[in-house]
Amino acid sequence: MAHKKGVGSSRNGRDSNPKYLGVKIFGGQAIDAGNIIVRQRGTQFHPGAGVGLGRDHTLFALVDGKVEFSTKGPKKRRTVSVVAEA
């Protein structure tokens, strides 16, 4: 017989770190090339002109300019573009 009661561990006690997702630069704001516009899981926003798509679906500026959000196509696909300022 055991002299001590067996102590079970609870199955809680874990929490993941926040991922800080979302839009970082909003429409009409100026941006430099290389800066992050949107951090996302999957393509909620699709890259347009002047915008690149990272390995984790992060959208970033390829050129300096102003950020523009638009909705295109029959599926109402949201795209992000960077319009270079002259």
Curated annotation (Swiss-Prot):
UniProt GO MF annotations: structural constituent of ribosome
PROSITE patterns: RIBOSOMAL_L27
SUPFAM superfamilies the UniProt entry points to: Ribosomal L27 protein-like
TM helices/strands, residue ranges: none
Pfam families according to UniProt: Ribosomal_L27
GO terms for cellular component: cytosolic large ribosomal subunit
UniProt record similarity statement: Belongs to the bacterial ribosomal protein bL27 family.
Name under which the protein is recorded: Large ribosomal subunit protein bL27
Gene assigned in the entry: rpmA
